[in-house]
Every structure is written in structure tokens, then in C-alpha cells.
């Protein structure tokens, strides 16, 4: 036990005090067969310099490929200042700001974050974040069920174009809460929700409708028609959106005749790296009339007794603070550090910078699709407009193509066949603002070579 800071004399004195001969006597009740006999094949310890050299040698084995994968996690440029600021001790090691008078900096940052999310989504109030996009959507569904007092069925319509992992998360969370989830089919020519299937439920008791924009395939849904349908059917509408797209597209608060009721999504594109799947954060915003049913924490601005502006945890109807049965959520925390990075990211870029990022993503993906669909055996799978990722169809087995692309140093996309069997040999590709013309040209050239092998 070399990590224990006792000198040999300290150890001897303590052993004598308890009548033990040596340290091993402390473990004599453990059978010898269960005692540690030393790790096998573990080399002797090395010093720091040797360790750094070994780490460098191992790091050189990594392959830094060009990434064209999206599917819910996107490679964006993150200004160096974002994590330089977010890593300051005041943010990095701070705990939940329960003591408002000692946490004004953190509280103001969260308040500014909420304001920015409301500006992006066109809504009136935002919470201080959720775990990730999937849990944010699941919580939004639960919130919608609580809000819809007219509905007696707890039936929720979810577009089949919503991210498959998000739909799985919803099923997991609501399965035992007497909520029926109905998946709407999509048009296999257009790649968007089949409005005919939605209209079949007109006049029926439907509690909520979940819409994705852009959807999992990157396509742009007919959000105005779907939102208006929900309003006329007395159904709570929930929008699951990509925050980057909101710098270009109409905000959900303006969809249809009256806008949606709840907006949520994945915050990873706003300053969080693609760190093996997390940690990320989810955002959720709504109208002020619904604020009492919003999960998580909400930061408010107020004035103290001396007339000075201050910030505090205004609403936090969580199971930690009130009766569990009355809580709006049993999630006990949020993703404050990732929200800090997102707030800094949005502040640094500003509206114009966010718009430039979204525009470049859109342009790059269109250039990518144009280049790839000129290759024999490659075609665009759907006809609907798309934002910054799209589905292509190949005349060869997609897994073989992906492996050959990987061998050439290209992460070529995501194969959705595992979620949609009817989409065999299709590939979901994405090109954000970090992809260059040279990257796109390399992908197209490599894919052309791969596709030509079949006819050779």
C-alpha cells in the first residue's frame, strides 16, 4: 500500500498497538486462494518522461480520418476561447448555484443561455438544460402529456423520421407511464412524414405530436402543416430541432398559425466536441403559459432590497425539492459546464456568425451531394430539401463501401439500415463548415474508385 503516507515507524507503531506482526496479518481471514497474488504480465513502473514517450507512441497509432458522419453528432469548429473560458475554475469546479448571493456569475451565465435559446427557438422561456437531446425530447413528451388537459388517451404521435435513438429513449422512459407511442410512417420517395398518415388521426383524441426539423435523414419536414394540424386537433406540438439550423430556418415559435408548444433538441453543435458520445446537453423551451410544467431548473432575474439586479434559481420543481409525485422531472441535475461552453460559443459567434456557420454547412453538403451523385451507382435517396446532411443510395453493399472508405482515411457516413430495413445500402452523409473543397473532392474521388471496382 505505497500510496498511504505513513513512514515505516508509523506503520510499526500501529501494528504493535493492535498486536499484529506485519501488514499481511490484517488479511489473514481472507483465504489464500482469494488473496492478491500479483498482476501477471504487468511491467515494472516507469518514470514520467518514459510514460510521456509511451503515450506519444500509442497516440501515433490513431488514424485522423476526414469525417462525413452526422446522424445527431456533428463536427463543428469550436473557437479556442470557448473552452479556455469554460475551463476556468470558477466554471469548471463550481457546484449547483443554490446559494444565489455567492453564485451570481454562474447564475447570470445560465440566464443569458436561456435568453439565447429563446431567441433561437422563438419561444418565451427556457430551462437551464437537460442531459442530452434524447432525454430532453422524452421530458418534452411527458410535459406535453401533463399539459394537455383535454386529452384522455395519452396517445402520442411521433414522426418516424425522428432520430431512432431518441424514439428508443422515449419508449424506455414512458413505457410504464400509461402513454401510448404511435410512430407515423414516412414517404419513402420524399424522406419526410407522410401527411396522409397524420390526417388519418384528425378528430381523434391525440395528446401530442412530435416533429423533427431537420429530420434524421437531414430532410426538411412540412412543419407549418403539421403544427397547424396539431393546433386544430387540440394536440400539444413538440419540435425536436438542430440548433445550428435555427440560424437559417424559421424558428419553431413561428411554425404554422400559432407556433409549436414545446421546443427541444441536442446542444452538442453549440461548442461541445464529439467526445465519444458525450457529455452533451439538451435544451428545452416553451411558452410562458406552460412554465409550471417545464422540467429542470429555470434561472430568473430579479431586484434585491437595495435595488440591484440579481439572479436566482426561480423555479426548480424537481423531486429533490418537492414531493416526487408532484415533480415535473426526476432528473436531478443538468449539464452546466456544457451549457457554459454553449453560452460562450453563441456569444462569440453572435447571430451573424451562427448564420455563417449554418450557411456554410448547407452549402458544403449540397456540394458534397452534387459531387457524389455524379458517380455511377450513387443517387440521392430522397427528393425533399435538406439542410446539412442527406441520404444517398448505393448499388453496392454499404458496409463494404464504408470499410474501404475507412481504409482510405475517410469516415464516410452512417448506414441507417439497422433502424430502417427498407433503406438497405443507403448512407447518411454530412459536411459541416469544417469540411473543405479538398475534403469533398477526396471523398468523391475515393468513392468513385470504390464504386468502379464492381464493374471491373
UniProtKB/Swiss-Prot annotation:
Database matches in Pfam families: GDC-P
Reactions catalysed: N(6)-[(R)-lipoyl]-L-lysyl-[glycine-cleavage complex H protein] + glycine + H(+) = N(6)-[(R)-S(8)-aminomethyldihydrolipoyl]-L-lysyl-[glycine-cleavage complex H protein] + CO2
Superkingdom classification of source: Bacteria
GO biological process: glycine decarboxylation via glycine cleavage system; nucleoside metabolic process
EC numbers on record: 1.4.4.2
Keyword Oxidoreductase: yes
Keyword terms, alphabetized: Oxidoreductase
Gene3D superfamilies registered for this protein in UniProt: Aspartate Aminotransferase, domain 1 (3.90.1150.10), Type I PLP-dependent aspartate aminotransferase-like (Major domain) (3.40.640.10)
InterPro entries, per the entry: GcvPA, GDC-P_N, GDC_P, PyrdxlP-dep_Trfase, PyrdxlP-dep_Trfase_major, PyrdxlP-dep_Trfase_small
Coiled-coil residue spans: none
Catalytic EC class: oxidoreductase
Family: Belongs to the GcvP family. N-terminal subunit subfamily.
Oligomer and partners: The glycine cleavage system is composed of four proteins: P, T, L and H. In this organism, the P 'protein' is a heterodimer of two subunits.
Protein task: The glycine cleavage system catalyzes the degradation of glycine. The P protein binds the alpha-amino group of glycine through its pyridoxal phosphate cofactor; CO(2) is released and the remaining methylamine moiety is then transferred to the lipoamide cofactor of the H protein.
NCBIfam families: PRK00451.1
Protein name: Probable glycine dehydrogenase (decarboxylating) subunit 1
Organism: Legionella pneumophila subsp. pneumophila (strain Philadelphia 1 / ATCC 33152 / DSM 7513)
Amino acid at each position: 500500500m505505497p500510496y498511504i503516507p505513513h513512514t515505516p515507524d508509523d506503520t510499526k507503531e500501529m501494528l504493535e498497538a493492535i498486536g499484529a506482526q506485519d501488514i499481511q496479518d490484517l488479511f489473514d481471514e481472507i483465504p489464500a486462494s482469494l488473496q492478491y497474488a500479483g498482476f501477471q504480465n504487468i511491467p515494472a513502473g516507469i518514470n514520467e518522461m518514459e510514460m510521456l514517450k509511451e503515450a506519444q507512441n500509442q497516440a501515433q497509432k490513431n488514424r485522423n480520418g476526414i469525417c462525413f458522419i452526422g446522424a445527431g453528432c456533428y463536427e463543428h469548429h469550436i473557437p479556442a476561447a470557448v473552452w479556455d473560458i469554460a475551463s476556468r475554475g470558477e466554471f469548471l469546479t463550481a457546484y449547483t448555484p443554490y446559494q444565489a448571493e455567492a453564485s451570481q456569475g454562474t447564475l447570470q451565465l445560465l440566464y443569458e443561455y436561456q435568453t439565447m435559446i429563446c431567441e433561437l427557438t422563438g419561444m418565451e422561456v427556457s430551462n437551464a438544460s437537460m442531459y442530452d437531446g434524447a432525454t430532453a425530447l422524452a421530458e418534452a413528451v411527458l410535459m406535453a402529456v401533463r399539459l394537455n388537459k383535454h386529452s384522455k388517451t395519452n396517445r402520442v404521435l411521433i414522426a418516424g423520421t425522428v432520430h431512432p435513438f431518441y424514439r428508443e429513449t422515449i419508449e424506455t422512459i414512458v413505457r410504464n407511464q400509461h402513454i401510448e407511442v404511435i410512430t407515423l410512417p414516412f414517404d419513402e420517395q420524399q424522406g419526410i412524414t407522410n401527411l396522409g398518415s397524420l390526417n388519418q388521426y384528425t378528430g381523434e383524441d391525440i395528446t401530442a405530436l412530435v416533429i423533427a426539423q431537420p429530420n434524421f435523414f437531414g430532410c426538411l419536414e412540412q412543419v407549418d402543416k403539421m403544427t397547424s394540424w396539431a393546433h386544430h386537433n387540440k394536440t400539444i406540438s413538440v419540435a425536436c430541432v438542430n440548433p445550428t439550423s435555427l440560424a437559417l430556418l424559421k424558428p419553431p415559435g413561428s411554425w404554422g398559425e400559432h407556433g409549436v408548444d414545446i421546443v427541444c433538441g441536442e446542444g452538442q453543435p453549440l461548442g461541445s466536441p464529439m467526445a465519444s458520445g458525450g457529455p452533451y446537453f439538451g435544451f428545452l423551451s416553451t411558452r410562458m403559459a406552460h412554465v409550471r410544467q417545464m422540467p429542470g431548473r429555470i434561472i430568473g432575474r430579479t431586484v434585491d432590497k437595495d435595488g440591484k439586479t440579481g439572479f436566482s434559481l426561480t423555479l426548480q420543481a424537481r423531486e429533490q425539492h418537492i414531493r416526487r409525485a408532484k415533480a415535473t422531472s426526476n432528473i436531478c441535475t443538468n449539464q452546466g459546464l456544457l451549457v457554459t461552453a454553449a453560452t460562450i460559443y453563441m456569444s462569440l459567434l453572435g447571430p451573424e456568425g451562427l448564420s455563417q456557420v449554418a450557411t456554410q454547412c448547407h452549402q458544403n453538403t449540397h456540394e458534397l451531394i452534387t459531387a457524389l451523385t455524379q458517380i455511377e451507382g450513387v443517387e440521392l435517396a430522397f427528393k425533399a430539401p435538406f439542410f446539412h446532411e442527406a441520404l444517398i443510395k448505393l448499388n453496392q453493399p454499404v458496409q463494404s463501401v464504408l470499410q474501404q472508405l475507412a481504409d482510405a482515411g475517410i469516415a464516410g457516413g452512417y448506414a441507417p439500415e439497422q433502424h430502417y430495413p427498407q433503406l438497405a445500402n443507403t448512407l447518411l452523409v454530412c459536411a459541416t463548415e469544417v469540411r473543405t473543397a479538398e475534403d469533398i473532392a477526396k471523398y468523391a474521388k475515393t468513392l468513385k474508385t470504390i464504386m468502379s471496382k464492381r464493374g471491373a
